[in-house]
Each structure stands twice: as C-alpha cells, then as structure tokens.
Curated annotation (Swiss-Prot):
Superkingdom of origin organism: Bacteria
UniProt keyword annotations, A-Z: Cell cycle, Cell division, Cytoplasm, Septation
Cited function: Cell division protein that is part of the divisome complex and is recruited early to the Z-ring. Probably stimulates Z-ring formation, perhaps through the cross-linking of FtsZ protofilaments. Its function overlaps with FtsA.
Subunit structure: Homodimer. Interacts with FtsZ.
Main location: cytoplasm
HAMAP family per record: SepF
Family: Belongs to the SepF family.
Subcellular locations according to the entry: Cytoplasm
GO cellular component terms listed in the entry, alphabetical order: cytoplasm
Entry-linked Pfam families: SepF
A biological process from GO: FtsZ-dependent cytokinesis
Residue pairs linked by disulfide bridges in the UniProt entry: none
Name under which the protein is recorded: Cell division protein SepF
Organism: Desulfitobacterium hafniense (strain Y51)
Amino acid sequence: MTMAKLFDKVIGIMGFADDDYEDDYFEEEEEKEEVREETRGTGNRKGAQVVSIHTQKQIKVVVMEPQAFEDSQSIADQLRNRRPVIVNLENAERNLAKRIVDFVSGATYALGGNMQKVGNGIFLFVPNNVDISGEMKDDFKEKGFFWSLTK
C-alpha cells in the first residue's frame, strides 16, 4: 500500500476525509443506472405503433330464394363481393331452378369459387376465400344433380 492511500485511509477513519469525491462518484453511477433502466423499459421504440394481429374478418353468409331468373345476377354479385350464398330453390319450378344453378355455378367457377349441394333444392355457393369441408358427392352419383328439384 502506498503512503498516499494509507494517509487517505487514516484520514477517512478519523472522519476528516473528503466525501465530495465519493458522493459525486456514486451520484454519477446512480444516474447511469436510471438511464439504463429507462432505455430497457421503452426498448428505444419511439413512434412505434401497436398493431393487432387479429385480422380475421367476419364473413356473412347470404341466404336467397330466387323467384325469377333475374335474381341469379344478384346471387353472382354477392359472390363477386366475396360473400358465400345459400340458394334455396325448393319452391322454384324445375326449369327455372336448373337455369339459376347453371348461371350461378358458371359465375362461381369464373370467380374461382366452389359449390355444394346441401339439401333438397338447397345449394351453397362460395367465393375463393371460403373453403367447403365435407361433401355429399355420393348422392350426386346415385341420384343425379337435380334429383330433388322435381315437382
């Protein structure tokens, strides 16, 4: 130990030491620690925006019961607007129902969508942003596509 350090230690024990140097040192360290804590908390993200990752849009299903062939265009418009459509043709005459299904299925194909028969005279037409799971293709093979449209 050098003579200067020994002298400073003795003076410190007696209470005559210069505490200003130590106080300044500890104050600087405390300020540095506060700055570190502040930057850790914010992560240096000034101007950052929080964006929700829940982007799933609620899809509405349109149910239509066309009375005339002209109604088939409004069904196609719904598909073009990316809305699934359930078409109820139970009360339509056979020729009209066949024409509507032909027109809407063509529009569905042109838009990249799909169709599914879900019941007697009831069809589901969906745009390309909707998938249909579960199929009833066995009924189509056995009874034909329009077997339930007879009156």
